[in-house]
């Protein structure tokens, strides 16, 4: 996955309201983040799959960062 896609994903995470990141279930959050990223960066199907898997492995980190922002 390109650095452009990674930067865009983390930019989206930072810009997303904390309540969204904390209250969505895992599957919905992964799908939502993939969709938001694909709106801004043209992704091929294998990149969509990889991005979804990457997000799944980072959900704890994403939620921890969101929790920090809420305090």
Give the location of each predicted region.
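Short, charged early-sequence alpha-helical segments and their helix-coil boundaries
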Residues: 42-71
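N-terminal functional modules and adjacent low-complexity/disordered segments of proteins
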Residues: 16-17, 38, 56
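DNA-recognition alpha helix
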Residues: 31-40
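Intrinsically disordered, low-complexity regions
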Residues: 18-21, 40, 47
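N-terminal acidic leader/helix
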Residues: 1-28, 63
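Amphipathic alpha-helical interaction segments
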Residues: 8, 28, 32, 50-54
């Amino acid at each position: 996955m390109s650095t452009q896609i990674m930067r865009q994903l983390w930019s989206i995470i930072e810009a997303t309201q904390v309540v969204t990141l904390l209250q969505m279930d895992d599957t919905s959050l992964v799908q939502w983040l993939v969709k938001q990223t694909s709106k801004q960066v043209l992704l091929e199907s294998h990149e969509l799959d990889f991005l979804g898997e990457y997000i799944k492995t980072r959900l704890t980190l994403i939620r921890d960062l969101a929790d920090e922002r809420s305090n």
